[in-house]
Structure formats: C-alpha cells, structure tokens
Amino acid sequence: GSIATIKGHIEGDEGFNGIANITVRDARELVTCRMNDANEPEGAKSAFTFYDRSKTIYTGNDSIRAGQFAFTFAVPKDISYSDATGLINLHAISTDRKTSANGWCDRFVANGSDINDNDSIGPSIYCYLNSPSFSNGDRVNPTPYFVARITDQNGINAAGSGIGHDLQLIIDGDMQHTYNLNENFSYDFGSYTSGSTFYALPELAPGQHRLLFRAWDVYNNPSTTELTFTVVKGLKPNLFSISCTNNPAHTSTTFIVNHDRMGSNVNVAIDVFDMSGRHLWTHSENGVSEGSAYTVNWNLTLDNGATLQTGVYLYRVRIGSDGSAMTSKAKKLVVVRQ
C-alpha cells in the first residue's frame, strides 16, 4: 500500500467553497462475458468482450476552500499493476448548494505500491443491524439493514482486485447468502483510515441467524466479526425521536422521523390536533427509508383547505414497517403567522 495525495482546483471560480465527491478507479480491464445465448448455433458462439473500470481504489469526500482542494487516499496492494491509466471522477457542490462542478482526470498510472512488513494487524470492525444501539442477540425485522464501520491506520482495501479480498458478508454460512459490499463502501469525510459499508438484507425466515463480516486493510491483513440475531415477523420499529425543522413554523415545516428501519419499506402517518383534542390534519405515506430519518413536508394546510393559524398544536407520528403494528410519539408544534 502507498499513500497518495491529489490536489486540484475549480476552474474559473476562485471563490468556490463546498464539498468534492471523489472516485478513483483502477486501469481498464478486458471483461469477457459468458457464452450463454442458447439461440446462437454452437459453432458460431463467441464470447462478447469489452473494457471496463470495475475496480474502485477510493471513494470519499473532502472540502473545497477558495476553489482549491486536496485529498489523500491509500493505494492497496491489490491493484492491476498495469501501465494503463487510471481515472479520477469528481463532482463538487457549493456550500449554498446553488453551484455544481464536474471533472475527471486520467493522466496517472497506479502500477506500484510500498510494502510495509511491520503491519500484520487487520482493520477494526464495528457492525450492527438497523441501529447502533443493536446488541448481539437482539431481535430484528425480517429485512434488517446491516452497517459496518471499519478503521485501519494504513487504509482499507475495498478495491476488489484480489481474489478473496472483498468486503464480504455471509449469512448463516450459506454461499447463497454471501454478499460483496465493496461498491457500498465509502470513506469518512476527509479520511482514508475510516469508513463504512452497508447492505439491506433480503427477507430472512423467522428464528435465529448468524452473520459473519470480513474486511481487509491495504496490506491484505484480514479481520472478521460475527453477530447473532433473531428475526421476528411483525416486529414494531423503534421510533427514536420526532422533530420539526421549523418550530415555531411560519408557512411550512418538515417532520423528521428517526427510526431503526434503514433500507426498509415504512408506513408513516402524521396527525395534527389543537390543544382541545380536535383533529385538524392527517397524512400517511409509504416509502423506502434510505437512512435512519424519514422526512415529510407540510405547508400547514388543513384537511378542510384552511391554513393553520397562530397557536400551539400537538402532532403525533406513527410508523410501521413490513406489515408490523405502528409505534407512535407525540410533540408540540408552535405556529407563528407573520
């Protein structure tokens, strides 16, 4: 593994401040498809080939200040060692989210790495299902969301170039339930020593299960961790907190629902009452929660078409998932009309 630092700038905008999303890919490789076209005569069959950059060396984010940026990443031992050029893709967004920029560079090769014989320790791994509050042996829903936090002082190997050196998740020791999590891995902001990967598990049968997760550092030192868990059909979600972006609200607000069903289909229902208990507004929707927070926008218009006036109100949020019963919390909403 080697440590590389890349510097650059936003062309024509010296005052640009924001965030750069960076992906560094290895050299192109020839990919040969399987000859599985049953309609093609046996003698005429020929494998389709194409070139692709299928191996990612680094994916992360870093800051841009006054149009200038720099990012550092670890080059794993598992690179192609080709004289062909690699590729850097960048996407930038300004702090005020009004301006974006894109760029790429292929004027470099990744065909060597330093060897550190002193590093024989694999990365540290912390993993959980659905929520960081998960404890080994806990109950989960049939489609739990797996997250692994990985740290290593020399960097993490998520390139997928070496045979067997993938970020790998195995359920119940079953090869049919073995998943490659390289593409889901991303380094923490401004870091090449810590990051995370994730996976939304397919529906599992009720009962006890075991998972094993394996990760490698850039010197190909492995680490593994295991979790046991019990799948319970119809298990209620954990509703950690509810809040509003504008409280007091003037013309609109956004309800924020924090829960433990990342990557799952959720059913969210919101009701608003006045302080005497009179029901004023209701809303329900289904959707996939990509993170641990589900948001619902509201323009303060009631069911009868009227506008919510200045006052103190009560809102109740209910959430369910995968056909489970609903969990609820309630809070106050203050409206101040201007």
Residue ranges and their predicted role:
Residues 232-274, 284-285, 295-298, 319-324:
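Glycine-centered coil/turn sites that cap beta-strands in beta-rich domains
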Residues 3-37, 162, 265-272:
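Beta-strand-rich binding/interaction modules
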Residues 227-228, 232, 245, 255, ...:
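C-terminal tail/sorting-segment detector
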Residues 23-111, 126-133, 147-233, 286-291:
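Long, low-complexity serine/threonine/glycine- and acidic-rich segments characteristic of extracellular
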